[in-house]
Amino acid sequence: MSDNNKKLIIFDVDGVIFKSQFLLCLSRNSGILSYIRAWYLCFLFSINYLSMRILLEKVFIRVKGLKEEDLWQLYCKTKMVANAEKTIQEINNSGHYVALISSGVPDILMKDLAEKLDAGCGYGIDVKIDSGFCTGEIGGLLSYSDGKLQVVEILL
């Protein structure tokens, strides 16, 4: 297949590669009240009452102090949909480029996921970690509502 026929295939991770929403799994790990609050915030986001940025800030401030090691353990426990790896491999074998994008999964985890699944790249939100602990601060293009569009434009 020539480069002219090579296509960029983009997968969102939450609910597509991962069976569930990483933000909710992260909140559940912080206790039932954090989970209920995160679920409610996700609902408000889904009806356009909250922006992406505010949703992420409110969820990640609740996990301030979480050990980076615990973040990795939660990621490792997150279940993927059946055949995710096989599907990406078949797309790669067809000569296409696979990108993984998420506004709810930290970038360090997305890079690892892309490597595990043999995707071309992975992009997530920037979660500040200082001395091995989450500070509750977030950043990066994907922490904003139009962030996915901006990342796609960069990839093109």
Please tell me what each predicted stretch does:
Residues 26, 59-60, 113, 155:
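Broad structural signal for hydrophobic residues in well-ordered alpha-helices, predominantly aliphatic
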Residues 1-53, 57:
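Active-site neighborhood of HAD-like aspartate-dependent phosphohydrolases
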Residues 53-86:
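Metal-dependent phosphoesterase signature
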Residues 2-8, 76-156:
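C-terminal cap/substrate-recognition subdomain and adjoining C-terminal extension
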Residues 4-9, 60-62, 69-71, 92:
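Long, low-complexity, intrinsically disordered polar/charged segments
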